[in-house]
């Protein structure tokens, strides 16, 4: 859903993509919070994927933040280690696919979190399209 207008994103907008080799460093990955709930064997990573300026311009986006909460049982991986692993798997999926779009990035995250140590993945996105 477009967070500015409240309208649903169409299939054409979600599948509109650009070749990955046309844009250098198309995605920014950031962990902005790591939680260790008490008395549990889980760790929660709050990961944010931001589209770079050139990718947003090619896809006619004003803002594109994809926020994920990844609930894992992996207590040994720190935030930076998990972020490197997550980034590598997402980029590997997108490199094999060759086209980067909103839906392909979400599919790449599903590929990266389809592991035995991942329990849940919660998504919360902030996407705004350009009007002009």
UniProtKB/Swiss-Prot annotation:
The keyword Chaperone appears for this protein: no
This protein's UniProt keywords: Host-virus interaction
Any single GO BP term: viral process
Superkingdom of origin organism: Viruses
InterPro entries attached to this UniProt entry: Gemini_AL3
Family: Belongs to the geminiviridae replication enhancer protein family.
Reported function: Increases viral DNA accumulation. Enhances infectivity and symptom expression.
Subunit structure: Homooligomer. Interacts with the replication-associated protein (REP). Interacts with host proliferating cell nuclear antigen (PCNA). Interacts with host retinoblastoma-related protein 1 (RBR1), and may thereby deregulate the host cell cycle. Oligomerization and interaction with PCNA are necessary for optimal replication enhancement.
Name this protein carries in UniProt: Replication enhancer protein
């Amino acid at each position: 859903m477009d967070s500015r207008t409240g309208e649903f994103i169409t299939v054409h907008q979600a599948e509109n993509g650009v070749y990955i080799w046309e844009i250098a460093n198309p995605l920014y990955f950031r962990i902005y919070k790591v939680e260790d709930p008490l008395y549990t064997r889980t760790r929660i990573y709050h990961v944010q994927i931001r589209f770079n300026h050139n990718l947003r311009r090619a896809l006619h986006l004003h803002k594109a933040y994809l926020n994920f909460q990844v609930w894992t049982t992996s207590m040994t991986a720190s935030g930076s280690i998990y972020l490197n692993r997550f980034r590598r798997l997402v980029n590997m999926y997108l490199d094999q696919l060759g086209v980067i779009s909103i839906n392909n990035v979400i599919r790449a995250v599903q590929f990266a979190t389809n592991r035995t140590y991942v329990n849940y993945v919660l998504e919360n996105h902030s996407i705004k399209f350009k009007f002009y």
